[in-house]
Regions:
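Phosphate-binding site of ATP-dependent enzymes
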Residues: 165-249, 270-276
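Active-site "cap" helix and flanking loop/linker of ATP-utilizing ligase/carboxylase catalytic domains
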Residues: 213-264, 291-317
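Hydrophobic beta-strand scaffold residues
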Residues: 29, 94-95, 123, 148, ...
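Short, flexible, mixed-charge acidic loops at enzyme active sites
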Residues: 44-50, 86, 221-228, 282
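Conserved metal-phosphate-binding beta-hairpin within the catalytic cores
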Residues: 188, 197-199, 255-288, 296
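Active-site nucleotide/adenylate-binding loops and adjacent lid/helix of ATP-dependent enzymes
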Residues: 1, 13, 64, 105-192, ...
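ATP-binding N-terminal substructure of ATP-dependent carboxylate-amine bond-forming enzymes
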Residues: 1-101, 105-107, 111, 130-139
Length: 317
């Protein structure tokens, strides 16, 4: 839990929920904090013990502790962009999220869209800008129209995102997004119902969870809406059975084509009655306010079962 990004506190919440809900008759869990400057375990009485980064071990009261599996709840870097996955793969330590390549790919919105287009996945119109490039508002408007969304290309939880309604807002929005990443993506506005689809590997099967409809009190599903109660999250979504099956099948298709494992949560907007893919989150939030645990509950899966299945799947991989 933890990480190096703006999502640090969200990750801590997720990690604590997992820690609390693991079956103690099967697992002996430790709370591992991975921060920019230090890696440590929180022991009894909240005592920190430093992690040996050369082999991911810790010594507590003279006893060397090694780990059979890592439950990865880090959002953003390094847990969601492939860095932690690559490190653990080198050490031959199983972990619960997707592998290095899938993690790096899905964290990069530009690359992910490029990979998915050959499979017929509909997306918003998009325009990409690298830091240092000239930003041409007229060219952007000609490509994606107004209103549009300016986003950091590699960031989660809607950090660094602005809904732009006029030409004069484009430059400030790009500067804001560049605070999160050196690449930005500008997307056309899609008017329609926003939904979130969790897809997981559960008991050795790929399972699409009940669909959640997202109704934000803000103009879009930003950080406040996601984590500070500024949205309604309605599970199951108020869409037809046909729409539900269609968006679940697309989410499962993406999961299979990318050779995913672990948890994923894909966001779509039904525009002109067609689901348009927005993004995939491969380390979705697992706090009490998060969508995927709500979906699991709606499917009759307890948190203990959900988290236990993730560990068992990782150990068998």
């Amino acid at each position: 839990m933890g990480g190096f990004s703006s999502e640090y506190r969200i990750s801590i919440n997720s990690g604590n929920v997992v820690y609390k809900n693991l079956d103690r008759s099967k697992y002996n869990p430790y709370r591992v904090h991975i921060l920019q400057k230090e890696w440590f375990i929180i022991g009894e009485n909240d005592t920190p013990y430093p992690i040996n980064r050369s082999n991911f071990t810790v010594t507590i009261d003279g006893q060397l502790i090694t780990f059979d599996c890592v439950f990865n709840t880090i959002h953003g870097t390094p847990g969601e962009n492939g860095l932690l996955q690559a490190y653990l793969e080198l050490l031959d330590i199983p972990q619960t999220s997707c592998d290095f390549y899938q993690s790096a790919l899905t964290f990069n919105k530009r690359d992910l869209i490029s990979v998915l287009k050959p499979f017929g996945i509909k997306t918003a119109e998009n325009y990409f800008v690298d830091k240092g490039d000239e930003v041409d508002p007229d060219e952007i408007i000609a490509k994606v129209g107004l209103p549009c969304f300016v986003k950091a290309n590699k960031a989660g939880s809607s950090f660094g995102i602005t809904k732009v309604k006029s030409r004069d807002q484009i430059i400030p929005a790009t500067k804001f997004a560049f605070k999160e990443d050196n690449e930005i993506i500008i997307e056309s506005f899609l008017d329609g119902t926003e939904v979130s689809v969790g897809v997981i590997t559960y008991n050795n099967e790929i399972l699409a969870l009940p669909v959640t409809e997202i109704v934000s009190e803000n103009e879009f599903f930003d950080y406040e809406a996601k984590y500070l109660g500024k949205s309604q999250e309605i599970t199951p979504a108020r869409i037809s059975e046909e729409q539900t099956k269609k968006v679940q099948e697309i989410a499962k298709l993406i999961y299979r084509k990318l050779k995913m494992k672990g948890f994923s949560r894909s966001e779509f907007i039904f525009h002109n009655n067609e689901p348009h893919f927005i993004e995939m989150n491969t380390n979705p939030g697992l706090s009490e306010a998060s969508i995927l645990p709500q979906q699991a509950q709606a499917a009759g899966i307890s948190l203990k079962e959900l988290f236990g299945s993730a560990i068992e799947t990782a150990l068998k991989a």
